[in-house]
């Protein structure tokens, strides 16, 4: 008898082997037939979706439509390999495996049964790899969105119905983009008003229950696009907005760097009136703005490549010069590869100001764009105004000093007269400036702010200072008590708290030490050093003087030895004191004491041009710097040159008040406050203090603490001497002061210099590098009494006139001729004598005529309150008499007033 396999008849819980095989074959056959049916319904070679467009026209957008189109995604996808870049709208790598519990779209792709997958994991490993979708950059997502926009335009043009974007997501191998009708009530957002509890329509549209849906399925595996359109009810359509002809030109010329900013600016223009009844004005503006931005500043999807294209375009015009990173040393190459900088300088701007810049400022910030991490800018001091001359962006926060050295060296090659660089306490910047062999001035604001915030000092500060060699030499001074700095006298957890009053006094003392200079101690009764001392000796003596002042106030007065050690470790050791204080730069008088020029530039850039946003692309930031900022910088340079160079220092300040730099405005306020204080004091006491401090008005030097702290180096003693010398001058006092430069004094008075300055240039020069400090201090002793009397006479003439070197104004001369013409008529003269306002004008005219005979260079145009024409009353009266002359010629006489 034949042997029978009984196991084939045993019924297992999951069925027999033959039944499982038969079921699997049936499923495969069913799946194959389903795929054949789907492939048979494909619309081939219809990239413009003419089939869908034809259906929309015939059905008028009412009904249901479902069709599959073929599309090749091979150019946008890679399979089995991870992508370098990924889309921002999706996860970095989209892996969809067959065993994942997800909702599978059975209408769009073939799928395997879950039970079959769980039992046959080993057989379908190769098939799993086909379900992996990886995106190459953002090309696939952008292409799908572009196709969706084309389809929405087809619906709008063919039916008039407006479909808007809705839900977006992905399933197995499929990207799904859904939309709905703008007027469908089912998709409106709940925004209830105060008294109306219903769906709020933000665009004032007519809403209907049209049951609309429009979805586009992009199947990457099958290379198909499935379109599902449903719009069951017919209703009124919205009016289509007409694009104004001037909209594109407006967006191009106004350079709004976001679509929202562009639309907000558009609201304040007449162009917006054509959008008032349109709900899709924002969409239209956004679309046109995107086209313009891609042609002007977003030249490439990669912002860095786009920025390089913009820089090359401006480099060809000569406005900027890119700094090369090739042909560098080995150490510099390593530093540049780490930072990966992109740097440029404003070449055309530098060529205009290079002969007038002796001091620059460097600073950095971290929040200008999302592509780079740190941004450096170099700002030049041009007659008290900040002019940006260089810009650098790096991909790392820890920038090496070699990279900063490479950047600063390129800037200094174009600015040969720079002697000092202002910076903060960044070690990389300080080290780079020292390698350039330039003077370094540390920002006063950063130093004082750090000291104000430090309110605790411990025993650790004292032990650290004891290992300092300079501190050991400090203990040898006779005014220092060694026992105070004995660590055994204090506990391990000993701390010193600094009160508000104490920190205020310490900060004031540190401010005086930072703003001090050896020139301010060269005259007066209380000299710190002798005239025969060398510059190095003077610097050391002043350093010891300020160190003693700090010791007296912190240790002896406030009993804060640990806090004194902290200040010594950070700021008052000789190395730090040299770069912190102007005392350490005896051959240069630094006008700038802070890096606020860079801070102000960054703040204006962020608030005015970037609208406080950090999400700008780097190419947009570069376009703002080169297209918007360069024009503003050139205009600022033009106005500054006109005010400081073409006009003499005698130019009236009030006529150019809006163009005044900040230091001049602050000086006006400071001068007025000092005058009010001077009126309350006795002049005798102030005069004695002037002799004690060695106050010199010619060189504008005073040794008092107020002159050191003052931004304009002005104090009550200098104002008192100026008031004594010119007691009868009551006009605009500050118009007498000349240009602000890096010479000494800080502010030069052209009215206080005689005509003999050309002959005695070596003695009268204010450049410290050309003349010694002793020569500057003894200038007034060498001047004779005759020169002083001549100086007073010429100064009085200058104060009456606006500009003694300028020609007579043609307009004023013509008005004088008209006035003389009316005086020549006897009848008119009688009427003039009866007019009370003209009596005062005649008196002024008589005085002015006498002055013009002795002073032929006098200029008639003036606005001074004590001497000159009253223009308003004069012109008004001339109009009356012109009318009188016309009436007299016609026979109607007299004219009543």
From Swiss-Prot:
Further facts: There are three genetic loci for mating type genes in K.lactis. MAT is the expression locus that determines the mating type of the cell, whereas HML (containing HMLALPHA1, HMLALPHA2 and HMLALPHA3) and HMR (containing HMRA1 and HMRA2) represent silenced repositories of mating type information. Notably, HMLALPHA3 is not silenced in K.lactis. The mating type is determined by the MAT locus, which contains either a copy of HML or of HMR. Diploid cells are usually heterozygous for the MAT locus.
Entry function: Mating type proteins are sequence specific DNA-binding proteins that act as master switches in yeast differentiation by controlling gene expression in a cell type-specific fashion. Required for efficient mating as an alpha-cell.
Name assigned to this protein: Mating-type protein ALPHA3
